[in-house]
Amino acid sequence: MSGPTDETAGDLPVKDTGLNLFGMGGLQETSTTRTMKSRQAVSRVSREELEDRFLRLHDENILLKQHARKQEDKIKRMATKLIRLVNDKKRYERVGGGPKRLGRDVEMEEMIEQLQEKVHELEKQNETLKNRLISAKQQLQTQGYRQTPYNNVQSRINTGRRKANENAGLQECPRKGIKFQDADVAETPHPMFTKYGNSLLEEARGEIRNLENVIQSQRGQIEELEHLAEILKTQLRRKENEIELSLLQLREQQATDQRSNIRDNVEMIKLHKQLVEKSNALSAMEGKFIQLQEKQRTLRISHDALMANGDELNMQLKEQRLKCCSLEKQLHSMKFSERRIEELQDRINDLEKERELLKENYDKLYDSAFSAAHEEQWKLKEQQLKVQIAQLETALKSDLTDKTEILDRLKTERDQNEKLVQENRELQLQYLEQKQQLDELKKRIKLYNQENDINADELSEALLLIKAQKEQKNGDLSFLVKVDSEINKDLERSMRELQATHAETVQELEKTRNMLIMQHKINKDYQMEVEAVTRKMENLQQDYELKVEQYVHLLDIRAARIHKLEAQLKDIAYGTKQYKFKPEIMPDDSVDEFDETIHLERGENLFEIHINKVTFSSEVLQASGDKEPVTFCTYAFYDFELQTTPVVRGLHPEYNFTSQYLVHVNDLFLQYIQKNTITLEVHQAYSTEYETIAACQLKFHEILEKSGRIFCTASLIGTKGDIPNFGTVEYWFRLRVPMDQAIRLYRERAKALGYITSNFKGPEHMQSLSQQAPKTAQLSSTDSTDGNLNELHITIRCCNHLQSRASHLQPHPYVVYKFFDFADHDTAIIPSSNDPQFDDHMYFPVPMNMDLDRYLKSESLSFYVFDDSDTQENIYIGKVNVPLISLAHDRCISGIFELTDHQKHPAGTIHVILKWKFAYLPPSGSITTEDLGNFIRSEEPEVVQRLPPASSVSTLVLAPRPKPRQRLTPVDKKVSFVDIMPHQSDETSPPPEDRKEISPEVEHIPEIEINMLTVPHVPKVSQEGSVDEVKENTEKMQQGKDDVSLLSEGQLAEQSLASSEDETEITEDLEPEVEEDMSASDSDDCIIPGPISKNIKQSLALSPGLGCSSAISAHCNFRLPGSSDFPASASQVDGITGACHHTQPSEKIRIEIIALSLNDSQVTMDDTIQRLFVECRFYSLPAEETPVSLPKPKSGQWVYYNYSNVIYVDKENNKAKRDILKAILQKQEMPNRSLRFTVVSDPPEDEQDLECEDIGVAHVDLADMFQEGRDLIEQNIDVFDARADGEGIGKLRVTVEALHALQSVYKQYRDDLEA
């Protein structure tokens, strides 16, 4: 029933008749022979070896496939990396080397790719495990199948298929191992099958039932085995994990042990070196200490002697200073008294001469009228006088010709002189002098005309009256008796005498008339000459204005270029422009080297040292006896720490150790590279100890000439000296940025720093400059300048008592200020100093036009002191505002001013000096006290020439004294001014409202005593006033002994509207009648002492008819009481006399954006918003924005802009703006009834193609301000979100001063507004 069980039974040769039965015959002989041969060859090899070979081939095939797949994955990754890098490189080249794309992390992408690879591998492993499980199940099923003698059961019906016993029956026998000798043996008799068929079927059915039961039991066993296999697998995995963890722990422990050993070795080397150095230093220090002790003893003795000598010298110095001060005061008072004495003496001499002339004329008139006895003598004298008159007439004619020639010469000389000296100013002076002479001549002509109207009768009556008065005085009564007795006798004779005297007087009057006619002609000639000079002056003025416009345009172009070049220089010197490069990929580098881009700042470089390998000589092997020594190397480069290579075993250790150093390419580094070498030491390690066995010197000077990697070798020298040729070291080094490019960048940076810090002067140079500057300023008044240009020199000497925001650190201060329309100027940074000495000197060339004049009179120069070490941006440690009004009057500003921080607390002092190089000449549209002083200068030229030049403003810092105010507590200033001219014609009080507003950061201002020179004003002389009134007013100008003190609003305090109204009442009480004659000054922060007309031409045209007002030159110092909120009134000033005039304040709206703060909102959490600036818009006017954008503040913090803008709304030039204010007061429906402040997000520098975005909006209603009757002074207004539903996002601190302008508009349109 069952076949043989031998495994090799199928391999025995049998007769195969099955193939021939099917008719294949010879067609299958070749294949069968081949199979037979292969089976015979396989039968010679054992089954176990065949299985072993098969399994090996199968495993090798699987490994090769896995390796091929890994290589394909690597190739794909490298291809994607290469494509990505090529695309990035092309994009960077198109953009121009811009910064790399944000949000891209190469390491993250690499990690993601590795994780994806692991996922793929795990999925493959999972599939293989599933296949194995399926195959295992199939094997279990096949093993449980029981073999039967029947391959199959024949079908009981005819299915049309060939029966299996025809072809398969004979083929099964060889497979089962049954041998047949003949084909007939295989046929079974049919009767036997039918006989046993039923019994076999029943047995088969029983066996099938048994087998089904066995199958069920086997399935249960299989499930149990599978469950057991899973349990074993989990246990196996757990054990594998435990083994791996133990292996990892052992490896980590081994690595930590090795690292600790290396660290210990390195520390031992360092400690050994430090010990040697410390011992040497200690011995040297001991010797120095002994020497210093001896020197200290001698220094103490000399110090005590010097201190005693210094105390004596200090006492002497104090005494000498006191004496000097007293002598200076006496000299000052003596100078003034001498001037007054000289002036009075000159006037006395003039009056005495006039008195003598009048006396002589009176005597002559008396003798000619009443001396009858000397008639004959008079006739002789008359003839002689006629002869003399004829001679004088001829002489007069010759003198007139000479005079005309002299005048012509004088005119030519004047023209030449005008070309050399300041032509415009000299022409003005000549015009004023000629004008004054013409006025005097007109007055004399009037007097002579009045004398010509006298009749002969009136003359005789006047002579008789004079004679009678004289006789009464003399008491000669006998003459009257004689006249009474002889009156009848000599009546005819007296009549004849009277007729003769009348004829003589008529002749004299005729001569006088002729002389007056001649003088009138001369005056006409003078008047024509004056008109010609005036036309010439106007032409010159037009030419000058055209030149000034051209110069201003050229200066604007030059300023723009300078600003651009300064920005480029600052970018080169301080910019953060980064140098990008890719590391070189050498042929011997591995393919998987991580590709990165290193970013270097300007001036930085990356120096690399690579220690490749060390080759020991055979002598080392013989001497040491160790075939595989354990070695490592150490070296130290420049000022960096010691570097250690890995520990390697062998005679030819390959360390492959690279160290990178971030260096600054400067003179020290270049000198170090060129001249110095570094020492590389080779150490041999013995477990936890080591020994230095060899050393060598590494040189790097070739890097200055070559670029890229420079490969070198160095010979090792044994430390013991017994082995001279110890071995060689192979190393290479390189600079990432090539040396030529690094040196070029360093030179550019050094050159830019030199340009930027070129204004930094040493203290000795500044001292010599300060000594020479006053001479230059004095000479500049007569020297000519290039057109209308002038230079303002600003010097920042020092700061004192500065404090850092961190109390335990010293600040690194520097000062920043902005003058006029020039760029910001900053000083050098003084590191770690509370009292820095800057000595920073800067000059600004400016055209003397109306814009500059308005700026000087209405603005202050703000000095900000910043701390360079402060990490928080835009927070200054001190600020002060210096008024510039004194510069508009050609005066120097020099003093020590008190600084205040952003919290309005005192923060130290600063010493600044501002002065002109040449004399400041105000433009033609503005008149100053100096121009008016030129009017009087022609009357007394000699006195003016004897005066010393104007002294600069001297300052004296006093103790600060707090003063309560609306929102500030500044310290008062004590201000006094010394007169530049000998007279002062008028006095004024400070204008109550027309002043510049002080910046809110200024709280404490130092109390300064200023001696300032003031210029007299034009005396107002009425046409009806007599000569006596003029003399009387002139005498009044000399009577005062005290100077008037004038106050600058920018130096004292801010002014509220209440104080303005109070001072208006005071000034109206003092002098209400001259209010209409006053015109407002262009200054917003100073007092022009006296009435000033709007321009020079109007003042000169009105000069003959001006009235003369008196003034007293007073010298007094007055202070404002701390309890007042406004400048001192007339009752608080002790030295002021005369009239005080009231000027109308300038009509303007002042807007100041101070600071911005944000709260917790979406704006603070939005990372795309980085920098913010503020925009301000008033109705349809162009928007004004802060000049800089500041970083977004954190929640609750403030950023300070400190930006101010002024909108002028005066009647003359800004009527449209006043109409807008009128509409606001009428509360009409307007698109913007208020000031609109918009907080705007500025895109970052690397994304300039993006547009600005409105973040927040704030409003200030001007109509509400007018109803409340007050300005907004440092008020915090709410900022609402412009993008969302209008929720609050922060606060904006602003100052809006518009109440005065609104009140002015309301007064002008009161009827319309009330209607």
Swiss-Prot record:
**Functional summary from the UniProt entry:** Negatively regulates signaling through the G-protein coupled thromboxane A2 receptor (TBXA2R). May be involved in mechanisms like programmed cell death, craniofacial development, patterning of the limbs, and formation of the left-right axis. Involved in the organization of apical junctions; the function is proposed to implicate a NPHP1-4-8 module. Does not seem to be strictly required for ciliogenesis. Involved in establishment of planar cell polarity such as in cochlear sensory epithelium and is proposed to implicate stabilization of disheveled proteins.
Q: Does the keyword Hydrolase apply?
A: no
What is the gene called? RPGRIP1L
Instruction: Print the keywords alphabetically.
Output: Cell junction, Cell projection, Ciliopathy, Cilium, Coiled coil, Cytoplasm, Cytoskeleton, Disease variant, Joubert syndrome, Meckel syndrome, Repeat, Tight junction
**What is this protein identified as?**
Protein fantom
Implicated disorder: Ciliary dysfunction leads to a broad spectrum of disorders, collectively termed ciliopathies. Overlapping clinical features include retinal degeneration, renal cystic disease, skeletal abnormalities, fibrosis of various organ, and a complex range of anatomical and functional defects of the central and peripheral nervous system. The ciliopathy range of diseases includes Meckel-Gruber syndrome, Bardet-Biedl syndrome, Joubert syndrome, nephronophtisis, Senior-Loken syndrome, and Jeune asphyxiating thoracic dystrophy among others.
Which GO cellular component terms, listed alphabetically, does the Swiss-Prot or TrEMBL entry include? axoneme; bicellular tight junction; cell-cell junction; centrosome; ciliary basal body; ciliary transition zone; cilium; cytoplasm
Tell me the impact of changing residue 677 to I: In JBTS7; also in a patient with Leber congenital amaurosis; affects interaction with NPHP4
Q: Which PANTHER family match?
A: PROTEIN FANTOM, RETINITIS PIGMENTOSA GTPASE REGULATOR-INTERACTING PROTEIN
Q: What is the originating organism of this protein?
A: Homo sapiens (Human)
The organism's place on the tree of life at top rank: Eukaryota
Indicate where this protein resides in the cell: Cytoplasm; Cytoplasm, Cytoskeleton, Cilium basal body; Cytoplasm, Cytoskeleton, Cilium axoneme; Cytoplasm, Cytoskeleton, Microtubule organizing center, Centrosome
- Major location category of this protein: cytoplasm
One Pfam entry name: C2-C2_1
Instruction: Enumerate the residue ranges of region (Disordered).
Output: 1021-1083
**Known partners and oligomeric status:** Interacts with NPHP4 and NPHP1; NPHP1, NPHP4 and RPGRIP1L are proposed to form a functional NPHP1-4-8 module localized to cell-cell contacts and the ciliary transition zone; NPHP4 mediates the interaction between NPHP1 and RPGRIP1L. Interacts with IQCB1; the interaction likely requires additional interactors. Interacts with TBXA2R (via C-terminus). Interacts with RPGR. Interacts with NEK4. Interacts with NPHP4, INVS and DVL2; the complex is proposed to be involved in DVL2 stabilization.
Q: In which tissues is it expressed?
A: Ubiquitously expressed with relatively high level of expression in hypothalamus and islet. During early development, expressed in multiple organs including brain, eye, forelimb and kidney.
Bias (Basic and acidic residues) ranges: 1028-1044
**Biased composition annotated in UniProt, kind: Acidic residues:** 1060-1083
From its record, what is one biological process in GO terms? lateral ventricle development
Q: Which residues, by range, are in coiled-coil regions?
A: 64-144, 197-256, 326-555
Question: In the UniProt annotation, what is the result of changing residue 937 to L?
Answer: In a patient with Leber congenital amaurosis
